[in-house]
Amino acid sequence: MSSKDSFTPDSVPVCVFGGGNGWGKRVAETMRTAGFDVRIVEKDASNADIRQAISASALLFVAIPDPAINSLLQDHGKAMHGRMLIDCATNKSGFSKRLQELASEGVSICSSHPMAVSSAALRGQNVLLMPIGSNAVAAENAAHRIYGLLGMRIARIDFTQHGEIMALVQMLPHLVQRTFIDALATGLAAQNQQIADLTTLASANYLLAELGLGRVAAQRGEISAGIIATGMASEFGRTLLAALRESLDTIQKTSDSRSELAALFDAATQRIDPEGSWRRDMADKSEAGLIRLGNLRSRSLAIEAPNRIGMLRDILTVLARHNIDMTALDSQLMTGADGSERVRFEIGISNSHLPQESICRELETIGVRLHGNDTRE
């Protein structure tokens, strides 16, 4: 049995700080389902309740708002000795020094950063693990178990690199997409167009970019504001902004020469991908994404079903009986209204007409619901 496997419900009582919502709630529910004894402590708990919870727990998972974490660590750090400590904060600058102090004192610490919102379908989503200090193994194993239960893809980085990496993978994309949205608003108003109109008019490149753009637009503005403000507070973040400005200036100055622009773009691409392997991989992935997107946008069925082995086979058997020609398939794990694990299938089809009522009746006999269909040409 590996050390990761030895992290078992009967050996590790867990305390989740901030377990009432967000990531704390998701982790608490997941660990309870796996059989762990989990207690929840909210950010407004009394010092006595916090001390009691720490004393009774072997693993402390911290999911309270970032600004409150440093106070928790300052006030109760000594009580955390002999325990495992994991945080899942996005911005660690306010308490990173205290985490490193506790690690040097022997607390087993693994900082983490899930790269998706807690309400998302998490299977295959990235989570960063950052063990701190020489005693981090136990906490890192615990983090592996927790995020493994959620089906997430684990990447390990150095804790001191976190801020710079977030500037690259969070600040820069949010910065570009928010300026893109602002420029689109100006252009759409000038042309008397609606944003939805562009989807039916646009090129393949726009449709792929629209996915990232739309995801950011669907989020509250404070999400981008927090990410960008945090990034800009660092010298590295400001360096990236300066590089972006310089690039735009150079493009504008060179825009009267296609050959110079092409050379500029090729040189930049060569800098990030000298051997071309990333570009080849992206060409394949983007083509596959466009094919699936095109199939699903043309004609599709949305089906919600219990998550069990053999369910997809049963659904496809029903569709085959009705001569439904499937062209694409995507799936997403979700939680049903009753708390059960369910899966949503988006199935691309070539049929222009469906015997919807009879299909619905047959699907209902196996516990499956047809959410709707789109049979646009």
Residue ranges, per PLM feature:
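Conserved hydrophobic helix-helix packing surfaces used for dimerization/oligomerization
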Residues: 12-15, 127, 301
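NAD(P)+-binding Rossmann beta1-loop-alpha1 motif at the extreme N-terminus of oxidoreductases
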Residues: 2-52
